[in-house]
Amino acid sequence: MAYKPTQTLRKLAEKSSLDIVSREFADYMDSKDPLRKMRDEFFYPRVKDLPGVDLSLVDGDQDSIYFCGNSLGLQPRGCRELIDRSLTKWEQMGVLGHTSGWCPWKPIEDILIKPMAEIIGAKDIEVVAMNTLTVNLHMMMVPFYRPTPQRYKILMEGKAFPSDQYAAQSQVHFHGFDPDKDIIEVFPREGEQSLRTEDILSAIEEHGNSITLVLFSGVQYYTGQFFDMKTITAAAQKKGCVVGWDLAHAVGNVELHLHDWNVDFACWCTYKYLNSGPGGIAGAFVHEKHAYNFELPKFAGWWGTDRNSRFQMRKEFEQIPGAHGYQCSNPPVFQCLLLRASLDVFEKTSVKEIRAKGDLLTAYLELLLLHYFSPSNDITKNGNTPHVSIITPADPKDRGCQLSVKFSVPVDKVFEELCKRGFVGDIRHPDVMRIAPAPLYNSFADVHRFISMLNAAFKTITPNS
């Protein structure tokens, strides 16, 4: 039977004898939240420190409503200590810090592997921290996009994140093919916002014999849809396709089992739900089944060579088995430490716990949005109050913590009014606002405050404004 977090919320409201739309119920949910203390692990922005806030409308000493962890996660409190310790070591030891003292720099990536492998459902040999997301997509397409006269196409979701599109287009063009013809895109049906799994599978079945790579997002950046990765991967591989995933909006947000799902490769950034800071080091996954296939082409560098011989400066490339063999250069130490500070927080809980809270938190946001601002609501029917439409799938298994919404009034105006009141989120043009309460540091009270804030913003906006 499908899990329905909205039903759980209603049962808890009934059990507590509290009105589900009341602030008291939100506070009750926070009091029962096993992750409630995780917020203390992060620096949380205050209203008065944000640009564009109108302090005549809001208490500047309050916490902001930060629903933008899908764009940039908050700073873990442990970051500064780790960075300061390494700066001090650099100050005191210079180059000797590579091999001596606290947390030697030479094997720095090792401090990231086990916790990241746990988060994505992988083995240690399958995971590496390196580069940035789009760079890693290119690095992975060297071995895994190898077109032939018979198989040369790439299958993607329509309106994928632009950088993914550019990477795929440039790879197709580099190999002498036509991106306009040889990248197949799957779009939602007319009148629908999300892709149906059956339509993705139909495209694989129809074009599979000419497709060499299926490259999708785990969670779609615009709509927030969480694709059925296991089913899509199996169907594509059955047709002889390689399968890769951009997990930028999935890692740290939804449960992943990349090894068990037999995914060929995946790439992700770490500055969203993994809270590694702006431009933080990215991650990559290469399935164990490819670990010892040293014949796969790659763009090689010395950090992908065997550690025991790396500094012997041999001409021969002795590839490290697994994902680590795809490294080119030594990773940026301070970026690794920033990510480690966040992984320390993740190790105090589990993705299962994070996902469980995220389901409830997002369901509560959805419930309140529909209660007050649904197009069919009696309040909005009179035409004087703007209404909200949610384009993210309603089924919790088909989404993470992000809800993408559209308004009956200009999104820029709504966003401006929210920002005046201490909201941090983002808009994606032409007309979507992304609202993403992050389970590690957001609360049910945050959700309730946001709804009150949205109501106040709507009161300043007329339907024709």
From Swiss-Prot:
<dbReference type="Pfam" id="PF22580">
    <property type="entry name" value="KYNU_C"/>
</dbReference>
<feature type="modified residue" description="N6-(pyridoxal phosphate)lysine">
    <location>
        <position position="272"/>
    </location>
</feature>
<dbReference type="GO" id="GO:0030170">
    <property type="term" value="F:pyridoxal phosphate binding"/>
</dbReference>
<comment type="function">
    <text>Catalyzes the cleavage of L-kynurenine (L-Kyn) and L-3-hydroxykynurenine (L-3OHKyn) into anthranilic acid (AA) and 3-hydroxyanthranilic acid (3-OHAA), respectively.</text>
</comment>
<feature type="binding site">
    <location>
        <position position="133"/>
    </location>
    <ligand>
        <name>pyridoxal 5'-phosphate</name>
    </ligand>
</feature>
<dbReference type="GO" id="GO:0019441">
    <property type="term" value="P:L-tryptophan catabolic process to kynurenine"/>
</dbReference>
<comment type="subunit">
    <text>Homodimer.</text>
</comment>
<dbReference type="GO" id="GO:0030429">
    <property type="term" value="F:kynureninase activity"/>
</dbReference>
<comment type="pathway">
    <text>Cofactor biosynthesis; NAD(+) biosynthesis; quinolinate from L-kynurenine: step 2/3.</text>
</comment>
<dbReference type="GO" id="GO:0005737">
    <property type="term" value="C:cytoplasm"/>
</dbReference>
<keyword id="KW-0663">Pyridoxal phosphate</keyword>
<feature type="binding site">
    <location>
        <position position="246"/>
    </location>
    <ligand>
        <name>pyridoxal 5'-phosphate</name>
    </ligand>
</feature>
<comment type="pathway">
    <text>Amino-acid degradation; L-kynurenine degradation; L-alanine and anthranilate from L-kynurenine: step 1/1.</text>
</comment>
<dbReference type="GO" id="GO:0043420">
    <property type="term" value="P:anthranilate metabolic process"/>
</dbReference>
<dbReference type="Pfam" id="PF00266">
    <property type="entry name" value="Aminotran_5"/>
</dbReference>
<feature type="binding site">
    <location>
        <position position="134"/>
    </location>
    <ligand>
        <name>pyridoxal 5'-phosphate</name>
    </ligand>
</feature>
<dbReference type="GO" id="GO:0034354">
    <property type="term" value="P:'de novo' NAD biosynthetic process from L-tryptophan"/>
</dbReference>
<feature type="binding site">
    <location>
        <position position="217"/>
    </location>
    <ligand>
        <name>pyridoxal 5'-phosphate</name>
    </ligand>
</feature>
<dbReference type="InterPro" id="IPR015422">
    <property type="entry name" value="PyrdxlP-dep_Trfase_small"/>
</dbReference>
<dbReference type="InterPro" id="IPR010111">
    <property type="entry name" value="Kynureninase"/>
</dbReference>
<feature type="binding site">
    <location>
        <position position="330"/>
    </location>
    <ligand>
        <name>pyridoxal 5'-phosphate</name>
    </ligand>
</feature>
<keyword id="KW-0963">Cytoplasm</keyword>
<dbReference type="InterPro" id="IPR015421">
    <property type="entry name" value="PyrdxlP-dep_Trfase_major"/>
</dbReference>
<comment type="similarity">
    <text>Belongs to the kynureninase family.</text>
</comment>
<feature type="binding site">
    <location>
        <begin position="161"/>
        <end position="164"/>
    </location>
    <ligand>
        <name>pyridoxal 5'-phosphate</name>
    </ligand>
</feature>
<protein>
    <recommendedName>
        <fullName>Kynureninase</fullName>
        <ecNumber>3.7.1.3</ecNumber>
    </recommendedName>
</protein>
<keyword id="KW-0378">Hydrolase</keyword>
<feature type="binding site">
    <location>
        <position position="249"/>
    </location>
    <ligand>
        <name>pyridoxal 5'-phosphate</name>
    </ligand>
</feature>
<keyword id="KW-0662">Pyridine nucleotide biosynthesis</keyword>
<dbReference type="InterPro" id="IPR015424">
    <property type="entry name" value="PyrdxlP-dep_Trfase"/>
</dbReference>
<feature type="binding site">
    <location>
        <position position="271"/>
    </location>
    <ligand>
        <name>pyridoxal 5'-phosphate</name>
    </ligand>
</feature>
<feature type="binding site">
    <location>
        <position position="302"/>
    </location>
    <ligand>
        <name>pyridoxal 5'-phosphate</name>
    </ligand>
</feature>
<dbReference type="InterPro" id="IPR000192">
    <property type="entry name" value="Aminotrans_V_dom"/>
</dbReference>
<dbReference type="GO" id="GO:0019805">
    <property type="term" value="P:quinolinate biosynthetic process"/>
</dbReference>
<dbReference type="GO" id="GO:0097053">
    <property type="term" value="P:L-kynurenine catabolic process"/>
</dbReference>
